[in-house]
Amino acid sequence: MENGTHVNGSANGFCIKDPLNWGVAAEALTGSHLDEVKKMVGEFRKPVVKLGGETLTVSQVAGISAAGDGNMVKVELSEAARAGVKASSDWVMESMNKGTDSYGVTTGFGATSHRRTKNGGALQKELIRFLNAGIFGNGTESSHTLPHSATRAAMLVRINTLLQGYSGIRFEILEAITKFLNNNITPCLPLRGTITASGDLVPLSYIAGLLTGRPNSKAVGPAGEVLNAESAFAQAGVEGGFFELQPKEGLALVNGTAVGSGMASMVLFEANVLALLSEVLSAIFAEVMQGKPEFTDHLTHKLKHHPGQIEAAAIMEYILDGSDYVKAAQKVHEMDPLQKPKQDRYALRTSPQWLGPQIEVIRSATKMIEREINSVNDNPLIDVSRNKALHGGNFQGTPIGVSMDNTRLAIAAIGKVTIAQFSELVNDFYNNGLPSHLSGGRNPSLDSGFKGGEIAMASYCSELQFLANPVTNHVQSAEQHNQDVNSLGLISARKTAEAVDILKLMSSTYLVALCQSIDLRHLEENMKSTVKNTVSQVAKKVLTMGVNGELHPSRFCEKDLLRVVDREYVFAYADDPCLTTYPLMQKLRQVLVDHALNNGETEKNANTSIFQKIATFEDELKAILPKEVESVRVAFENGTMSIPNRIKACRSYPLYRFVREELGGAT
């Protein structure tokens, strides 16, 4: 305040410390992405959003957008903003009364701005009329209606922008929109019809239409009921009747990027969470695939310098540190180093290098959109301090279009590594002993596991890769070539929302498959232990000594027999462990044959012949082993396994528990 008059701009118009805002932008990207996401989730859950014009976050926008589903979040306006809003509104009225020529106040709009009028109120009314050009389908949530969650996001962002006091609108109108939000009254906006260049003109005009009581305006109430303007005002508790727009107020309501940036905020909240989830899923993938944790070594990533990669590797390293699966895998590698390749395939080994840049892109886009939702982006801007209206182009939504295109490309890349990992997981040629399609049932002919899921994943990923194509290179000149370049911000945000939905489908399918793999590793471990014990018992009974207690040369076979069990994949024989065409019985027999061939002269003696004991050994095993294997399956189904699930001692356990216990996601 100067001499009792509100001043809404600094004397020189620039911040001396950081005039180009690069310092603030760079500072916003310091610190950890993980910490940012945790903060975002915390903000999303807060019950109140306090608006002052400059501190709104994407997570708060996402929280308000989701609040319409029953989790109410209240919006409060800063009383300190009232004076600035009033000052700009008063300036417009005084300017009009003095006969000052101002765009959108005394002139037409866009390509017809050469026209003049002194009837400012009627001009605003006509603005809303001609912008109400959207097309709706049947119903209030049809394929041609903007999702109500996105409308709520747009309302919040527009209030925040107008609170800064550069737009020439009454504070009472902002209070009315706030009441709509707090009482879950949502105007119906068209899904299409904006190019986000002179702002999101067409969809925002329907909010203005509701405020002014246009007959075609509709809203949806808390229970999904359709409301006309009168009912919407009544349920929201907005008193004083419909608003008669003063000069500039219609333009202030529609000439902003709130619909595009609101939806972008919703998208980026989910994109950040999904990016973090992809890092965690990659670590769990390493666990169930018996991967080598060396790929997360900090020196490797420090030498690459990229912060997203370094953090992705650190998160994976943290999850794998001390993992029981990693310890078990290390024993497998030591026991038979030739059983699998020296290095894991790229989908695992280079996952930090792949995911890191995508996270950097998403993080940068988040900061860009947060700047946008705290920006004043209409035209003209009312600078009370210099007693002038500034004609510019802050309504151009290029930050939205560019950030959404980039985010969509990053989302597609995350989807690509997700399906690559999933494809390895369900393929028994690559997955280090897990059954084909993660089936694991008693009868492989009647259990196809995730075969349908793999087909669905291919469909999801194909659509996702198509959506990765940019929107912003499809600009068409509009409005008699006045809007000859335009951002297509909302269109890009809508496509990115589709991409996020598809990545959620992929991540959900993949997560359930990982949980299935964890359970199969548990079954595998118990089954292998039982098979080893059974083979050991039969070997001691049949191969160790004769009827008179004499020791047989065949007693030395047991160690090699158990080594076969250790090395053989359980699910290669689990459905019928004694079937002679399966590798287990073939290799056990080969051990006995090899020992017999090395038995020398004693092999000629029927009492010490190993060949003579092969049939007895196999018959004894066939009598016992299938029953023992079946008992393991029964214990698995009843949750009474003798060896506990390794996942419970791992840092990835909370995610497994969430799916299997909280959601009940059994397969």
Swiss-Prot record:
Swiss-Prot/TrEMBL keywords: Cytoplasm, Lyase, Phenylalanine catabolism, Phenylpropanoid metabolism
2,3-didehydroalanine (Ser) PTM sites in chain numbering: S198
GO molecular function: phenylalanine ammonia-lyase activity
EC number, as in UniProt: 4.3.1.24
Main location: cytoplasm
Pathway the protein contributes to: Phenylpropanoid metabolism; trans-cinnamate biosynthesis; trans-cinnamate from L-phenylalanine: step 1/1
Per UniProt, location of the 5-imidazolinone (Ala-Gly) cross-link in this chain: A197-G199
Entry GO terms, CC: cytoplasm
Post-translational modification: Contains an active site 4-methylidene-imidazol-5-one (MIO), which is formed autocatalytically by cyclization and dehydration of residues Ala-Ser-Gly.
Reactions accelerated catalytically: L-phenylalanine = (E)-cinnamate + NH4(+)
Xref: Gene3D superfamilies: Fumarase/aspartase (Central domain), Fumarase/aspartase (N-terminal domain), Phenylalanine ammonia-lyase 1, domain 3
General function of this protein: This is a key enzyme of plant metabolism catalyzing the first reaction in the biosynthesis from L-phenylalanine of a wide variety of natural products based on the phenylpropane skeleton.
Subunit: Homotetramer.
Name this protein carries in UniProt: Phenylalanine ammonia-lyase
Natural source organism: Helianthus annuus
Lineage per the UniProt record: Eukaryota, Viridiplantae, Streptophyta, Embryophyta, Tracheophyta
